């Protein structure tokens, strides 16, 4: 069974969060938490928060052991953008887009999804 966790309207662009998501995709969930602890980016904190929530959901709601879970899927979609104006010279204004994104993590059991597990690969 797959365990799904979502984090919607995150105040960071999808491009920045995808850098972190690509690092941990396919890894064991507990290993991914250790990796995220060592990355010094705001996006790493956001993904770590979501991953902890997904692990808690798996343990509490479905009775899974945390050691056997892998991140089978993680994807980041663009959310809505807040439009702001920045004053410029001669009475003009430029538009600033404050982007948001939606993060989705799907955890699965190693035994049930062995082809999705690539935790033995080294990260580039």
UniProtKB/Swiss-Prot annotation:
GO terms for cellular component: cytosolic large ribosomal subunit. It comes from Buchnera aphidicola subsp. Cinara cedri (strain Cc). This is Large ribosomal subunit protein uL22. Part of the 50S ribosomal subunit. This protein binds specifically to 23S rRNA; its binding is stimulated by other ribosomal proteins, e.g. L4, L17, and L20. It is important during the early stages of 50S assembly. It makes multiple contacts with different domains of the 23S rRNA in the assembled 50S subunit and ribosome. Keywords: Ribonucleoprotein, Ribosomal protein, RNA-binding, rRNA-binding. InterPro entries: Ribosomal_uL22, Ribosomal_uL22_bac/chlpt-type, Ribosomal_uL22_bac/org-type, Ribosomal_uL22_CS, Ribosomal_uL22_sf. The keyword Ribonucleoprotein applies. The lineage of its organism: Bacteria, Pseudomonadati, Pseudomonadota, Gammaproteobacteria, Enterobacterales. The gene is rplV.
């Amino acid at each position: 069974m797959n365990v799904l966790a979502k984090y919607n309207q995150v105040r960071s662009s999808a491009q920045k969060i995808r850098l972190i998501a690509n690092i941990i995709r396919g890894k064991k969930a507990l290993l991914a938490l250790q990796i995220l602890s060592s990355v010094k980016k705001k996006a790493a904190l956001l993904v770590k928060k979501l991953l902890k929530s997904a692990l808690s959901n798996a343990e509490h709601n479905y009775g899974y052991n945390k050691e056997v879970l892998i991140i089978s899927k993680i994807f980041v979609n663009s959310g809505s953008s807040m439009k702001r104006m920045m004053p410029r010279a001669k009475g003009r204004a430029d538009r600033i887009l404050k982007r948001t994104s939606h993060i989705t993590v799907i955890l699965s059991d190693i035994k049930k999804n062995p082809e999705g597990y690539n935790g033995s690969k080294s990260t580039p």
